[in-house]
Structure formats: C-alpha cells, structure tokens
A protein has these predicted regions:
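PLP-dependent amino-acid enzyme catalytic core
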Residues: 1-325
Length: 325
C-alpha cells in the first residue's frame, strides 16, 4: 500500500462527530484522480472523479432526497400522516426511501418498468411502495401517473424532483463548495450527466462566477438527444436523458453538450472499474466517457476536468452493464 499523501497525513482519524441520523451523513464525497484510464485513451488532461456513491444510499440523489424532504418539513407542507408520491428513475426513489424511513413517512414511487430489479428491491427493502409504468412512455408516463395519484390520495404531496428548487439549491450549498474546496478552485471543466438537471445547475451557478473560464459540460444519451434538440428514444443509460427538458435546468450555465451512446457508456463504466478500481454505474460511464473525449482535445492538455460519478455499479447487476460477466 502506498504511503499516505502529505495532505492526508495531517488529518486526525475519524470524522470528529457522531451523526444524529443517517440523513446527516449525506455529502462530503471524495474526489479521486484517474491515474491510468486517461493515459490509456490518449487524454492529456487531469481527470478527477467525484464519487457520489459514497453517500449513504450510494448515489448523488441522496443529496436531493434529504434536501427536498427537509425543505417540505420546514415549510409545513408535510406531517406524520402525509403520503409522499414521486416519479423517479430509481436512485431518487432510493434516496427518498431512506430519508422517509428515517423520518417516518409513507412513500409511493412511480417509475418506468425498465428500471433495474436491484433498484426496485432496494426500494421495497426500505419500505417504499412501487408503481411501474410502461418503459416506452419514459419518465413522462411515470410523471403523469404520479400526478394522478396525488389528485386521488388524501394528504399527499409530490416533492417533484424535476421542479423542486431544493434540488439545485443543495448542489449550490454542498456539491459545488466541496468541488471548489477539494480542488482549490483549480478546475477547467465540470462534466455531469443531466437527469433532473439539479447537479449541473447548482454547481454551474456557483462555480462559473468564481472562475469565468470554467466550461460546464452536460452529458446526454446519444440515442435520446433532447437537450441538443433531438427526439426522445429509449436508451440504456439509467438516470439521465429523461426525455424532456427539466424545469429546474439552467441552460445558461451549460457551455457544451456531449452525446454518449449506451454502448460507450457501458464500455467506459467497465473500464473505469477494471483499470481504476472505481465501480460506477452506467451514467458514470457516460460522464467519464465525455471527460475522456474532452481530455483528448489539444486545447485540454494540462487542464483539470471534474466529472460526477453518480452511482454504484452494484445497482445495475441485472442490466447490460453486467451482461457476459
């Protein structure tokens, strides 16, 4: 094992506190330098991966799951008998489920039937009720069903991850500040897949004013290039490419959109695991593939790219990510 770096050696072991609940453990995820993958792909930039699967329920969505429920509590919108109902592609549902379990709320989640069985089992494990909608309808179908459930369920509320301002706000307050502090502000590109748009909006709104030369790069499925003006089509990159432009997405912070196809996302996620030992999901592969593309450009030599690794690979065991393994 390598000796600790000078910076890590000065830290005292432990966190210096005991968390009052699992919700308090969200955030402060590590940023890790990719040491071999960029070289293997001919990239001459420094590529850093922010590993969001270090959150308690193993994804970036833990941040918004906690933030949305806490915001509704503070606003007096929910009580002990409230039923939370949300359309979700999976990881937001798991985030809401662990927070709801911790705080004692009933939760119903609506999702496309194409979502992995691991996500569904985890949701049930955490006590959530699951309603599946046709895969061909994408997230639009799940949203319509969830809205109907809210209309017909007394004392129910929808957090509305695609519209809820607590979503980008938590990334402004936490994710952006973590990236800035951990890199010392030395960041030239920020790369993130777009699902709800909360991560790229929150981070972009905070970091671009501080570093005007910073380029914010959105990643979307090549098969469903809605951000680029194309049509929604089925794809295998779960968690991004919802098929519409989310209300909370601030497109003004985006400098570039990179389209990654499902096969490349899967191939890159596998390479990330085998070459770097970083077990990310399919959307992680998409973000890293985009970062590698950018890193190979002549103008990117010597630059620093931070890419979001949103979730853990184990959540995709039944998907194409693990086919043939």
């Amino acid at each position: 094992m390598d000796a600790p770096s000078p910076t890590s050696a000065v830290h005292r072991p432990g966190r210096g506190r005991v968390f009052d609940s699992i919700v308090d453990a969200v955030g402060d995820t590590p940023i890790v330098r990719l040491r071999k993958l960029p070289q293997a792909h001919g990239a001459h930039a420094t590529i850093l991966a922010k590993l969001e699967y270090f959150n308690p329920a193993a994804s970036v969505k833990d941040r918004i799951g906690a933030a949305m429920i806490i915001a509704m509590e503070k606003a007096g919108l929910i009580n002990a008998d409230t039923v939370l109902i949300e359309p979700t592609s999976g990881n937001t549902g798991i985030a809401l489920a662990f927070v709801a379990a911790s705080r004692g709320y009933r939760l119903k989640l609506v999702m496309p039937e194409s979502m992995s069985i691991e996500r569904r089992k985890m949701l049930a494990f955490l006590g959530a009720e699951i309603i599946l909608t046709p895969a061909a309808q994408g997230m639009k179908g799940s949203i319509a069903t969830a809205e109907e459930l809210v209309r017909t369920t007394p004392n129910s509320v929808m957090p509305q991850q695609f519209k809820n301002l607590a979503n980008p706000e938590i990334h402004r307050r936490t994710t952006a500040e973590e990236i800035w502090n951990d890199t010392g502000g030395n960041i030239d590109y920020f790369v993130a897949g777009v699902g709800t748009g909360g991560t790229i909006t929150g981070v972009g709104q905070v970091l671009k004013p501080r570093r005007p030369s910073l380029r914010i790069v959105a990643v979307e499925p090549e098969e469903s290039p809605v951000l680029s003006g194309g049509q929604h089509s089925p794809h295998k990159i779960q968690g991004i490419g919802a098929g519409f432009i989310p209300d909370i997405l601030d497109r003004s912070v985006i400098d570039e959109i990179v389209k990654i196809n499902s096969a490349t996302a899967i191939e890159t996620a596998r390479a990330l695991a085998r070459i770097e030992g970083i077990p990310g999901g399919i959307s992680s592969g998409a973000a890293i593939a985009a970062a590698l593309q950018i890193g190979k450009r002549p103008e990117s030599a010597g630059k620093t790219i931070v890419a979001i690794v949103p979730s853990f690979s184990e959540r995709y065991l039944s998907t194409a990510l693990f086919e043939g393994i």
